[in-house]
Amino acid sequence: ILANSHYIAERIRKVWRREAEVLHPPVDTDAFTPVAGKQDFYLIASRMVPYKRVDLAAAAFRRMSGRTLVIVGDGPQMAAVRAAAGNVPNITFRGHVSKAELVALMQSARACLHIAEEDFGIAMVEAQACGTPMLAFGRGGSRDIVRTPEEMDAPTGLLFAEQTPEALIDAVERFEAMGGAFTAEACRANAERFSAAAFRQGLREVVARHLGHG
C-alpha cells in the first residue's frame, strides 16, 4: 500500500491495521520558480469551500490592520469569506486568476497561508518552489511539507496548532519576529524533495524493493 503522506499512512494503520509506504505525489516544481524581490503581503489561494477555512484568514487579518492579505480563488463560500473580512483596506480579493498570475503572486508574497487539513497539499509545495515560506495548519500533509525551525536550521515555514484566527495571528507575529530565518533558497531546496524526478526515483525504489531486485 502506498500513501501520499505520513498523515494518510497513519490513517491506514488505524482504520485498516495495515502498514503503508509513503510516496509523496509529484509536483511540477519547474513551473514554480523563485524571483528576486518580495513584496509586503501575505497570500492565500484556495477554492472557497468550508474545509479550506479561508474565512479564518480573513478574520485574522481583519484584526491585523498593519498586515496585507491577498485572497485568490472563488467558490460557494465566497460570501462568508467576504463577511469575515469586513470592508477593511488591508484585505484584497483577486477572485479567479490565471496560472501565470498565481505564480507571480506566489513568487512575490512575503509568505503563503494554508489553513485546511489536507491529505497532502500540493499548493504548499508550489509556494515553496517559488521561494516563499508557508504558514500552515499543523495537521495533515503540512507536517511532511513544511520544515519548521524546531526541525532544522534552514526552516521553510511555521505550523500552528489550531484552526482559529488567534492561532494564525500568533503564527504571523512569530514569522515577523524571526526576520530573515526563512530564505528563498531553503524553500526551493525543500520543494525539490517533491519534484517529478524525486517521485520517479522513489517509485523505482518501491518497485525494486517489492520485486526483490534493484
Predicted segment positions?
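Conserved donor-binding/catalytic core segment of Leloir-type glycosyltransferases
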Residues: 34-52, 57-66, 70
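Short alpha-helical donor nucleotide-sugar binding micro-motif in glycosyltransferases
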Residues: 96, 104-109, 203
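Donor nucleotide-sugar binding/catalytic pocket of nucleotide-sugar-dependent glycosyltransferases
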Residues: 1-33
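Nucleotide-activated donor-binding/catalytic signature segment of Leloir-type glycosyltransferases, i.e.
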Residues: 79-101
